[in-house]
Amino acid sequence: MLLRGFSELLKCRGVMMKMRMKMSGDSSSLTLTEQQGGIRRIILNNPRKRNALSLQMLESLRENILTDADNPELHVIIISAVGPVFSSGHDLQELSSAEGSDLPRRVFHSCSELMMLIQDLPVPVIAMVNGVATAAGCQLVASCDVAVASEKSTFATPGVNVGLFCSTPAVAIGRTVPRKIAMQMLLTGRPLSAQQALQHGLLSAVFSEERLEDETLAIARRVCESSRPVVSLGKQIFNTQMSQSRDAAYSTAGAAMLDNLRLRDGQEGIRAFLEKRKPVWSNTDDCIH
């Protein structure tokens, strides 16, 4: 079954870590985490460095995402940030190290792994942006399944202005916004406003700063109302078929629909609809046959 293969992929990436996540008040922590009601919140917490995606920050984010990710009680992740900058991208000090240093390669590799992990994860990931997202920070927004922002937020890939073209951010951004908009961002480094980002598909929604958190949580809670394995399978198949030809995509999606029907929760949802009642999800990937 497609869903089980997806689960095995995550296990290989270390999902079986069984650490309990608690809110940390330590100002030295690069990220803060909390989980309640099926929603895990991961907060970038290095405003002094503009929440730069340093190697340490990338590793912290990866750990926060993977920890207990196979827990059926986890339904959705929200990534946000402390301060006026969501993330300024890579820490340029790490990229200006001495010749022969392996650090830049490790940074780029870790960043790419994180972006792919977000898309391979069995639960949706929501970016909640209230400020500036540039370079790899913009890449992080583009890599999330849903992205919402405040009206004051801006998005840019200004690497070209400092002599380092945003080639890896271009992978996520070029798959999210139209090609010519992506190239304009990459070639000029000029930012998009929140409304422009919404218009071109980088964002799912824009809210006032005052409403941003409540509206984001409302989206997350709506996700939590659905069966986790059904959502997981749907996310996996959506991402898979997007890179396929039309015929292959229909074949993949058709097989997924059959897999979905075999899920215990798939049958429960149909029965609940026919019986005019709310479904009682098992939130497990158990199959009925």
Swiss-Prot record:
Disulfide feature: none
GO terms, biological process: fatty acid metabolic process
A GO cellular-component term linked to this record: mitochondrion
Entry annotated with the keyword Lipid metabolism: yes
Main localization, broad class: mitochondrion
UniProt transit peptide range: 1-14
Pfam family for this entry, one: ECH_1
InterPro entries xref list: ClpP/crotonase-like_dom_sf, Enoyl-CoA_hydra/iso, Enoyl-CoA_hydra_C, Mitochondrial_ECH-domain
Subcellular location(s) of the protein: Mitochondrion
Domain of life: Eukaryota
Any one GO MF annotation of this record: hydro-lyase activity
Keyword Hydrolase belongs to the record: no
Keywords carried by this UniProt record: Fatty acid metabolism, Lipid metabolism, Mitochondrion, Transit peptide
Function, as annotated: May play a role in fatty acid biosynthesis and insulin sensitivity.
Family according to the record: Belongs to the enoyl-CoA hydratase/isomerase family.
Protein name listed in UniProt: Enoyl-CoA hydratase domain-containing protein 3, mitochondrial
